[in-house]
Amino acid sequence: MPLLDSFTVDHTRMNAPAVRVAKTMTTPKGDTITVFDLRFCVPNKEILSERGIHTLEHLFAGFMRDHLNSDRVEIIDISPMGCRTGFYMSLIGTPKEAEVAECWLAAMEDVLKVKQQSEIPELNEYQCGTYEMHSLEQAKEIAKNIIAAGVNVNRNDDLKLSDEILKGL
């Protein structure tokens, strides 16, 4: 099985909250797709709550689009990581990490403005696979923590696992 890009970086040295360009690729038509690692928690030390990350999934995707989409950037998808330490964001374009960090913080401010659970988009049995597994309170707590900490940048060159380590795993 091929080694995926996300497993070639040292998770023990990742900072959080932090933005990282996980991957870039060019489509056959010449568009650049960039995948960002939006790391909310330090891997293996912290984890996002189940209900909190699920509620953020519903809110964050729309709020990030409000702040980042433009004539040069279009978000394709924002999905939670299975390890519950962050989200992957795939988009068309090549925004700088600082711009993504700024938009991420603005999106977290938007989460804090949501007044009640009924304002969470697609919160019903028709549009959500586990519509009862939400917590606006937990999502707001996550947002507050991100805002308080600020968002840094993780660089692949700083996190790359050596060939020697990879061979030993």
Curated annotation (Swiss-Prot):
Pfam families: LuxS. InterPro entries: LuxS_sf (IPR037005), Metalloenz_LuxS/M16 (IPR011249), S-ribosylhomocysteinase (IPR003815). Binds 1 Fe cation per subunit. Fe cation binds at residues 54, 58, 128. One of its GO terms (molecular function) is iron ion binding. Belongs to the LuxS family. Involved in the synthesis of autoinducer 2 (AI-2) which is secreted by bacteria and is used to communicate both the cell density and the metabolic potential of the environment. The regulation of gene expression in response to changes in cell density is called quorum sensing. Catalyzes the transformation of S-ribosylhomocysteine (RHC) to homocysteine (HC) and 4,5-dihydroxy-2,3-pentadione (DPD). This is S-ribosylhomocysteine lyase. It comes from Shewanella loihica (strain ATCC BAA-1088 / PV-4). The gene is luxS.
